[in-house]
């Protein structure tokens, strides 16, 4: 109930026409994707993100065949059958992954992640140039990136990444775009594009108006002491 309420609160902040997905990586941040996934699906989530293919396999078993499941790590060695057999979509993060994907899963859908300035995952401008012919053939179903400093709303990197993402994505065939995770949603409509990807905010981990914590830490006090100053 709490996680669903947080998702709805974040979805309500999206600009009109923007889809709100849900990030369930690391077993829904340790809360159990097998429980959180079906709950969010019933609330209306149509697109889920996980970190690894094995997480996607487990989530597919929990939520059924219809919602899209995208894997943020992309296509790793030995994962081709998992993607094909469980209808998972890799987020391709490098020119190598693009080449490997085209060979391993020809005709299969993919997404592509761009490095707009965080320097963690994604193709930078040079890699995009090298991979552009293959990506033009593949026609990714989603183009995404991630903000490095969205937790600091007035950080100049946010606007710089917004411009860089728009420029890089504009070189690809037309496709829906996604830049904002939870903190990006809170930056405002310019960052929302076609799809937002709240993760930690679903669980109350990043405070916003209307947010509710999904977990509460409580513990007994075992012992107290009086300590003199300087002791």
Question: What kind of region is each of these model predictions?
Answer:
Residues 1-89:
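A charged N-terminal "starter" segment
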Residues 91-93:
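Ordered, amphipathic secondary-structure segments that act as subunit-interaction surfaces
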Residues 13, 26-43, 96-109, 114-228:
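Active-site loop/helix belt of alpha/beta enzymes
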């Amino acid at each position: 109930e709490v996680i669903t309420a947080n998702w709805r609160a974040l979805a309500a902040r999206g600009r009109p026409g923007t889809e709100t997905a849900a990030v369930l990586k690391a077993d829904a941040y340790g809360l159990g994707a097998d429980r959180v996934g079906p709950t969010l699906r019933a609330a209306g989530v149509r697109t889920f993100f996980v970190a690894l293919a094995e997480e996607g396999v487990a989530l597919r078993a929990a939520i059924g065949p219809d919602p899209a499941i995208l894997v943020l790590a992309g296509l790793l060695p030995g994962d081709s059958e998992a993607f094909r057999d469980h209808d998972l979509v890799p987020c391709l993060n490098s020119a190598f992954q693009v080449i490997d994907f085209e060979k391993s899963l020809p005709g299969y859908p993919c997404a592509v992640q761009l490095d707009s300035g965080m320097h963690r995952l994604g193709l930078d401008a040079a890699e995009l140039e090298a991979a552009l012919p293959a990506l033009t053939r593949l026609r990714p179903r989603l183009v995404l990136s991630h903000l490095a400093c969205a937790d600091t709303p007035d950080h100049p990197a946010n606007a710089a990444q917004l411009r860089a993402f728009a420029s890089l994505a504009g070189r690809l065939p037309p496709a829906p775009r996604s830049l904002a995770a939870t903190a990006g949603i809170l930056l405002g409509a310019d960052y929302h594009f076609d799809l937002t990807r709240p993760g930690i905010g679903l669980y109350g981990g990043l405070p916003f108006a209307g947010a509710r914590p999904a977990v509460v830490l409580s513990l007994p006090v075992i012992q107290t002491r009086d300590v003199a100053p300087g002791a």
